[in-house]
Amino acid sequence: MKNIYLQPDVNGFVNEKFLTVAISDEVRKTKLNSYIPAGANTHKVYSGKPEEYALYFISLMKNSSQLNANFNKVVQSYSSTGNLVEVERIGLFSVNPLTCPGIDSGKLFLPEVNIVEGVRLYEELILREGKLPEVNGVIFI
């Protein structure tokens, strides 16, 4: 798919239809393609098709960034050592720039880069946990 279709509008929002195609294309390249995690039916991932994962990821994006490519928020959370830390969340997938080594945080505002990194991080999480994260939960990727 051409990146021109993923360009956000004036307010930073990306068309959901084009997002579905771009995410499906990215999922096809991963181990998530045809993978059915435990409890996936509750998130409408019945057969592990890339399109089903795309709709699942879009529901996550709607919850976190409202499909806004310019999304940028600093959240406070507790680390594993119990310290309060501030973490920046960027782009459609609300990605933490620290989890994307080698990528400039400014590039995470580009939908095509954010989709690649977001799918990569969720692939690692889903394969490690063996289940899909809850859509209404706070997910730190």
Residue ranges and their predicted role:
Residues 3-141:
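Catalytic glycan-binding domains that act on GlcNAc-containing polysaccharides
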